[in-house]
Amino acid sequence: MKGIKALVLMAVAVCASLVAQAQGNNGLKYVNALELQIINKGFEDTYSPYSRLPLKVEETIKTLDGRGALLDRGRNSAGIGIRFSSNSARIGVRYNLVVDFHMVHMADTGIKGTDLYILNDEGVWEYVNTNRPIKDSIQHKIYADALPTDRMREYIIYLPLYDGVNWLEVGVDSSAVISKPIVNNPRKEKKVIFYGTSILQGGCATRTGMVATNMVQRDLNVECVNLGFSGEGKMDMFMAEAMASIPEAVAYVLDPIPNCTKDMCTNLTYDFVKKIREERPDVPIIMVEGPMYSYTKYDRFTKNYLAEKNAEWRKNYEKLKADNPKNLYYVTAEGLSGNDNEGTVDGIHFTDMGFRAYADKLIKVLKKLVK
């Protein structure tokens, strides 16, 4: 099976190379991203290098009726980044999308674009540019042509949030050097594991660097594994088991309430969280309430129902806390998308402002837990 998969991947790479040559390379030399460093990924044994679920979980999902969407979302590359060092004045990218997905309420730059960041002289990750997806089999972009060349610099390319990539290459000037990162930032030995829904996956950031998990990664210098799955954050026990198996985990952030019914919040929460606690008793767990969407101020049923779900979530937190008060934390819904009702694109899914507010609220808790 592994031999067949290797042959298929080799064939894809050869075809990609031929297509890229036909398009021209803009004077850049391109390196397969697999020769660099993949960050913000929780599992090695995945369907592709740029997908998020372990094969064991994929096989479990295939046995379940009506859960195909979780399989699809798991093959989106949300949160994953490519880390490398280079002294090139120009940096480019080219890649092939899995789906070429589109949504009416989210920018294509967030769905299937890529962002380039540089680690500046102050040690802060600084945004450089975004590639705007085009109607072509190969996405390509030269992000910049005047990057500093005085020494090797550190870079991240963030991958699509609501699509996946079959392959990706990073381009640099023909005389430049490109290598695996020299600086350990984010720290690969520390991973914060985020689990949740479409919002956590990145709906609806305008570009890939603006999802909350990538903000936390840059601000706290730790890898952040994005296990947000649109419509599918339903506290499946196999997900708790998978998350508990990640050896580098230094904190878990659990945010599934938007995808759960009140009954699910009542009946699944305790066992789901308990499973992670049993497997990783020394790793902090942060339980995040579901956001009180801005439109609910004027929608009586939804306002009451969301409050009821959060109340059940809170009851289970108190029960778990009574069992063992250590390493369990709670974040309320207040201010999750900001405090002015302007943090969403559709009353539910976050804008960049909403993600900044969410990240800031989580950072206040995480920075005390992640040394």
Model regions and ranges:
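Catalytic nucleophile-elbow at a beta strand-turn-alpha helix junction centered on a G-D-S/GDSL motif
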Residues: 189-210
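Oxyanion-hole/transition-state-stabilizing segment in secreted/luminal serine hydrolases
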Residues: 204, 208, 216, 234-279, ...
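Substrate-gating cap/lid alpha-helix
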Residues: 293-331, 357
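Structural recognition of the beta-strand scaffold that forms the well-ordered cores
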Residues: 191-194, 223-227, 250-255, 284-288, ...
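Bacterial N-terminal signal peptides
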Residues: 8-17
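Short helix-loop-beta junction
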Residues: 213-226, 318-319
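Histidine-centered active-site loop/cap adjacent to the catalytic His
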Residues: 346-371
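N-terminal secretory targeting modules
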Residues: 2-3, 18-191, 367-371
